[in-house]
């Protein structure tokens, strides 16, 4: 009987110790984050617990790309950022911009890689705080996004295979009846529609694939923004950008935009206010856009 009582008491003791240990562990895990940066960013910093999480493709040079090391060839003063949950790194225009914003706010930067087709799902799921990747306003996105200030102003171009007769075309009307494609889930199909009677082929997931299809002759023409087209031509010399005359080129469709703007989930006014203040604080303007896009193009690996 005494042995049974002792065993019972011993068992109860073990349970109590386990509960106490679990409680202690939880308290240690729940150590409150304390922000020590600039007061104007404190509310947002506490919201994100000191980590600015940014969603980008890491496959959209020169805005962003994936590389195996943190080194930037020819620029020892620069380093690529690690991709969350991966052994790879990323760099490009988005990373330059994000790092400047994170540093201004006194936050750690964390880059999350996601395919363009599902990048908004990651934002909705709370995997990251904002999306960049050259994203722009659209009526559909406006139903679930709030926008920060412009971080790049783009214009759009046509790429064709080098040596093709289309290389010398200077007016949209000359591309009549040709085979076109562009990246999926963008507003570029509205630009293709400005060409007379285009043959629109299926849209691939990335601009890199568009460049490849043009280079291989699977399509006659691809439509994308100038930096991405220029970057693609550096990587693939079999593709060139057509020089379209002003007044005979693309116009921004009604209700569309060519202003690239980082965006957060709708209703997150704390994030919008803080990010706007940070962009103002770092003096982001057209000169910044030109300077850092030039740097991104210069540092892009030719394999991207």
Cite the ranges covered by each PLM segment.
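Bacterial N-terminal signal peptides that target proteins for export
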Residues: 2-10
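Periplasmic-binding protein-like
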Residues: 152-160, 234-279, 297-304
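Bilobed "Venus flytrap"/periplasmic-binding protein-like clamshell domains
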Residues: 58-61, 86-104, 135, 157-211, ...
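Extracytoplasmic small-molecule ligand-binding "clamshell" domains
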Residues: 31-134
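Acidic, polar ligand-binding/catalytic clefts
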Residues: 95, 99, 103, 108-174, ...
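Ligand-binding clefts/hinges and TM-proximal coupling segments of bilobed small-molecule sensing domains
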Residues: 27-34, 187-205, 241-243, 274-304
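A ligand-binding cleft/hinge motif common to bilobed small-molecule-binding domains
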Residues: 118, 134-144, 191-194, 215-216, ...
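C-terminal motif of bacterial Sec signal peptides marking the signal peptidase cleavage site
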Residues: 19-23
